[in-house]
């Protein structure tokens, strides 16, 4: 099947690593395996069939934990959608499934480097994110 979109660019819109102090760093270093990865995707039309797709990763502990670090990245993809795409469902699939599946390997590498460079080496996300499956679950 021919792709009905083209990613014309990607960039890091925002990136954050917050560890407030040394006691928190020591606490988090021992507990970071309990942190959860959350994903959010949003988009907005720019002009002439160009869409900005923001894929946001957040890696954090439960809200009730006081000593915690927070890691977040917003990775933006500039997407040119084929003018033949007019169906809302098809557009939704491009934004929520196709683009994230294509950019995720780079996004994960950048995010893991952020964690390593923030003093938390060796973190791996055991489960690979299947945006196709998430999209199907959302549709049901």
UniProtKB/Swiss-Prot annotation:
The protein's assembly and partners: Homotetramer, a dimer of dimers. One homotetramer interacts with 1 SecA dimer.
GO CC terms: cytoplasm
Top-level taxon of the source organism: Bacteria
Pfam families documented for this protein: SecB (PF02556)
Recorded GO MF terms: unfolded protein binding
Gene Ontology biological-process annotations: protein tetramerization; protein transport
Localisation: Cytoplasm
Keywords, ordered alphabetically: Chaperone, Cytoplasm, Protein transport, Translocation, Transport
Protein name: Putative protein-export protein SecB
Family in the record: Belongs to the SecB family.
Function: One of the proteins required for the normal export of preproteins out of the cell cytoplasm. It is a molecular chaperone that binds to a subset of precursor proteins, maintaining them in a translocation-competent state. It also specifically binds to its receptor SecA.
């Amino acid at each position: 099947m021919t792709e009905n979109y083209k990613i014309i660019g990607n960039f890091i819109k925002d990136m954050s690593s917050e560890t407030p102090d040394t006691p928190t760093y020591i606490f988090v270093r021992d507990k970071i395996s309990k942190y959860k990865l959350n994903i959010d995707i949003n988009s907005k039309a720019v002009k002439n069939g160009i869409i900005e797709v923001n894929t946001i990763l957040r890696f954090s502990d439960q809200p009730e934990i006081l000593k915690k670090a927070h890691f977040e990245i917003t990775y933006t993809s500039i997407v040119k959608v084929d003018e033949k795409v007019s169906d809302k469902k098809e557009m939704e699939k491009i934004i929520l499934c196709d683009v994230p599946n294509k950019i995720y390997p780079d996004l994960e590498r950048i995010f893991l480097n952020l964690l390593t460079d923030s003093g938390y080496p060796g973190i791996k996300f055991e489960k690979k994110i299947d945006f196709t499956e998430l999209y199907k679950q959302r549709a049901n």
